[in-house]
């Protein structure tokens, strides 16, 4: 018998003024200069941190983390469409207690970020964990 996978559903509303609302929840208005491209990079950083934190806590660690991302958009050679052709993500995190081997934890954090897994290109990660 096949096991049914968990399903996560999300919704957001964007009004004519650009304000984003979670139905029945909070509203945010991006500051001047924020584009959908910036929001995608921010979502990738947040998702990467959340994924890392989830797996670290399962192993008994407390986490404090911050991050940044840079992306390059240009015309792809494959189809002539403008798209992200490179994304670099840097995450700085502290684990308490410290971990001896981070290999599996970092692999799971990258693998289980839904935003990164959805992209057509694989982000390049740089992790700094102490």
Where are these regions (language model features)?
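Extended beta-strand/beta-hairpin segments
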Residues: 1-45, 50-130
